C-alpha cells in the first residue's frame, strides 16, 4: 500500500487573515495517480463542466465563478469521506474539532449558522461526492483524513506575542496539521508500504529537521536533501518510514497537497 499526504495553507499573504492550514491523507496501490484515477469527475489544469477542479486553490478560485468552484471541490471531497456535506458552517467547524468560542467573540464571525453550500448545488455535491468515493473504491484507494485548522485573530495574536516572529507563529500553526497527519500515518504504515507527505514550503525556510524532531520525538530523522526550492527528510520509527518533502509549488506535485490548499482557501 502507498500512503500520500499533503499540507498547505491560505491566508498568510500581504494582508493576513484568517490563516487556515489544510491537510489531506490518502492511500492506494503502488503507481496510483489520483488525478488519473478520478478523471471522470476531477480536472487539474482547467475547469470542465460537471467536474471539480483539484489544483492550486488560487487558480481554482479565479474568475467570477471561482468561489462556487472552490466550494464544490471542498464539499465534494468532504462528502466522499463523510457521506454528506455539512448543513451549516457551525456544523462543519464542530466536525473539524474547532473551539468556536474565540470565533464567536469576533463580530465578523457572529453568524456561524450560515447554510452550506453558499453557492454550489447541494444535490450535485452529494451525487458527485458519492461518485468520487465510488471511483476511489474501484481503484483500491481511500481518502483517509481531511484536517483543517483555522487560526483566528485572538489565537494569532497570542502566537505573535509568544514567538515575536511572524514566521515562527506561522509554522506553529502549520506544524499542528503536519503533526496530526504524521501521527495518524505512523500506526498505519507497514514495513513494505511507501509513505510520502508533500507540504508546501513555508516562506523562505529551508531547514526543517529540528521542527520535525519536535513533532516526532520518537522518530530518527535524516536529511535527504536541502536545496533551493525543496527540502526532503526521511522519518524512521521502528520499521516504518515516511518521506516528508517541503517544496515550492507543492500543489502541482501532489494531489493531496492541491486538495489541502482548496480546503484551506
Placement of each model-derived feature along the sequence:
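RNase H-like, Mg2+-dependent phosphodiesterase core
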Residues: 1-265
